[in-house]
Amino acid sequence: IAAGEVVGRPASVVKELMENAIDAGAGAITVEIAHGGMALIRVTDDGCGIAPDQCQTAFLRHATSKISSEYDLEAIGTLGFRGEALAAIAAVSRVELLTNQGQGLGTALSLEGGQLVEQEEAGCPKGTTMLVRDLFFNTPARLKFMKKDSAEGAAVFAVVQRLALSHPELSV
């Protein structure tokens, strides 16, 4: 149920991943989709990356790196802070994370239906790539509510356009 509140369609996945990239200080974000985002969503950024010991934690519900004390709640300066998005996305898809903080090797992590499949070191540039495949593969009832690929793709485009226009400092 919680995943459905955050992840209603491919456009909501793209929104959450782009907002994470913006919060990570990205200057450039690339968004790629296949079949309206139902088969594949790839969001790549050149932000700060995720520390290797935080990669698994990032996919836990209510886990966030954006709040470290109760006082942070009074001055939230990020787009996301609840720690719901990545857990919700991972729960209903197959996710691959590739991330590097810019020092040495990065980290590759795979999850399926929210369960860890593998984590290993990997060569990759600074930043993060999130690959989301087979959205709602394990919730067939949700698939019935998806519109045609073209309609889902148009919704993704609208989200990308809206975030790009509201953040002119970004290259999207």
Where are these regions (language model features)?
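N-terminal phosphate-binding caps/lids of nucleotide- and nucleic-acid-binding domains
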Residues: A2-V172
